[in-house]
Amino acid sequence: MRDRLILLPGWGLGVSPLEPLAAALRGLDEHFRVEIEPLPVLASTTLQDWLDELDATLPDNVWLGGWSLGGMLATELAARRGERCCGLVTLASNPSFVSRDDWTSGMPAATFELFLGGFREAPNTTLKRFCLLCSQGSAEPRALASQLLGGAPKAQPDILLAGLELLGKLDTRSALQAFNGPQLHLFAGLDGLVPVQAASDVLALLPDVEVGLIEQACHAFLLEAPHELAAAIQGFLHESGDD
């Protein structure tokens, strides 16, 4: 089913941010199936539990993709499935959201720990702050943050906390290197959560994959530039289909 793409959303904000991109992709090719699958509702912080849930839910032999945490999970699932996955598309998705000694293009660990502590203390306030960080770099950050927050589902704090802790633990570099299918990784030049250096570092890690940069865009570039993203994804899918 090379004409089918499953997209996974990022942390805490539900499927709404991906809907404009899905609509733009369908508009470019009415025969191409684009579906958005919600993240698993799990209180576990163990990656295997999340992958087991996704592997049981999502069809085989499709393209896998996702935004931020969703892209990281799509990467891990693609590596698990191998030839049962047509290819991988990630959007503003850092192989390691948090900086490590050998991956410095992430959020400083101390900053992430403060954010995690803030969520434990005041989840609603911290989610609002997260929306502002997602929209940092946008021409209208507050309006975009309000749109993100307005579309977010009412999730239980313990479920959100588990997802946030997983985000802080994940390091998908081995999975990226293990997956031999076609890969496209798109980044935003004004991203307040994923440093732009991550794009160069991904290309250095994976010299044979496609890496793109939407320069004047924030982390929530799904809402800022859905048609530009859709055009890049469609071009990549067509090229991969011709190989």
Describe the residue ranges of each PLM region.
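Catalytic histidine-centered segment of alpha/beta-hydrolase-like enzymes
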Residues: 217-230
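Conserved alpha/beta-hydrolase catalytic His-Asp/Glu region
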Residues: 120-170, 174-175
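Short beta-strand/loop motif that positions the catalytic acidic residue
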Residues: 179, 185-187, 191
